[in-house]
């Protein structure tokens, strides 16, 4: 935003469109791996972070495509809002420019592979991949001669700030969960939500409407630690894939960065936008992009393959469908085990049974001990 917003305003872009596209582009990072929201949701849903990242690939591409189609529509039907750059402002495509672009892209691609590639290939856990990402980022900063002790302290301070906040929220959420479970609150929630008409789709529609309005007042950490653990068992009982459920909630919760009263993306944009840009323009410019994010939520609800297509297709075994058959003994019918059966009982006690086999001993008489 610091770089692109002044340039767009300089060449006559509509302020609402310019601020909206910057704010919406920033919120995509909540869905595109490596997203912190996906990591937290994977932990709360008991699913692999790698699977959650794979499931988010499809919706990420869909969201970018929806945004691009909207901009293309405006450039065709409302060209005054997105005017073309004058010829003198356009750079010429030459070998030097290509090499410069590649020189800036390759280190970033390597850093992305250190984090995401190692997770997808099973070479590292998310914690180990995060450590590799830190080492790679510090190496890039050192290569550009920007690695200073002040920068390291700033990074450590930000990390401790976020970690402390998450830990305290987790402690409070755990206390709430213990009390809630002790009062059988989960049974009440399950009974209430399982009766929603429409089956799994009706449940997802209700939950996403609920999460959308809840995000007006709560941060995604509070929603993930308090609300999601109550909804996950119900979703699983309805046969909803928890990866699909988690990615869907992640897409929904990114809207909280675009609408009041918090709208962190809008506040950050207000802090960097020039005074000529009105606050009302920033809020009004976010409305179309917020609508497109909700359209993506609807697409993922009715098209779960956009998430599950990228996942491993290994079938899951439902323990409730396993049937165990115990073979019958002797000639009792059914599947019998060979050479396994009770001794014949057609003889009187103390007498030989049929087929020359010994009968059952007479237990009414005292045992006889032969000297």
Mark where each language-model region is.
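Alpha-helical transmembrane segments of multi-pass membrane transport proteins
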Residues: 1-371
């Amino acid at each position: 935003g610091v770089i692109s917003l002044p340039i767009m305003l300089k060449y006559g872009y509509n302020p609402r469109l310019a601020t909206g596209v910057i704010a919406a582009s920033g919120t995509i990072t909540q869905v595109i791996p490596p997203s912190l929201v996906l990591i937290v949701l994977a932990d709360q849903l008991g699913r692999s972070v790698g699977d959650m990242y794979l499931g988010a690939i499809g919706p990420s591409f869909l969201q970018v495509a929806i945004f691009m189609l909207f901009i293309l529509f405006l450039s065709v039907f409302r060209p005054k809002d997105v005017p073309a750059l004058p010829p003198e402002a356009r750079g010429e495509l030459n070998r030097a420019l290509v090499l410069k672009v590649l020189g800036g892209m390759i280190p970033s691609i390597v850093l992305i592979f250190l984090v995401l590639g190692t997770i997808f290939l099973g070479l590292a856990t998310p914690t180990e991949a995060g450590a590799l990402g830190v080492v790679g980022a510090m190496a890039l900063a050192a290569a550009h001669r920007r690695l200073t002790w002040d920068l390291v302290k700033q990074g450590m301070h930000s990390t401790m700030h976020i970690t402390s906040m998450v830990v305290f929220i987790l402690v409070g959420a755990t206390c709430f969960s213990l009390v809630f479970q002790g009062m059988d609150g989960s049974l009440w929630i399950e009974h209430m939500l399982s009766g929603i008409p429409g089956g799994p789709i009706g449940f997802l529609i209700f939950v996403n409407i609920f999460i959308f309005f809840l995000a007006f007042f709560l941060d995604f950490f509070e929603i993930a630690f308090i609300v999601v653990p109550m909804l996950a068992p119900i979703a699983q009982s309805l046969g909803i894939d928890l990866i699909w459920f988690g990615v869907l909630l992640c897409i929904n919760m990114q809207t909280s960065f675009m609408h009041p009263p918090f709208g962190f993306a809008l506040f950050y944009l207000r802090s960097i936008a020039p005074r000529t840009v009105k606050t009302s323009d920033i809020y009004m410019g976010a409305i179309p992009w917020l609508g497109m994010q909700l359209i993506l939520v609807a697409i993922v609800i009715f098209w779960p393959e956009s998430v599950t297509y990228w996942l491993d297709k290994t079938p899951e075994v439902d323990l409730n469908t396993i049937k165990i058959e115990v073979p019958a003994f002797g000639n009792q019918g059914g599947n019998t085990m060979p050479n396994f059966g009770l001794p014949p009982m057609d003889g009187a006690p103390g007498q030989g049974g049929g087929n020359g086999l010994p009968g059952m001993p007479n237990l009414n008489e005292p045992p006889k001990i032969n000297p």
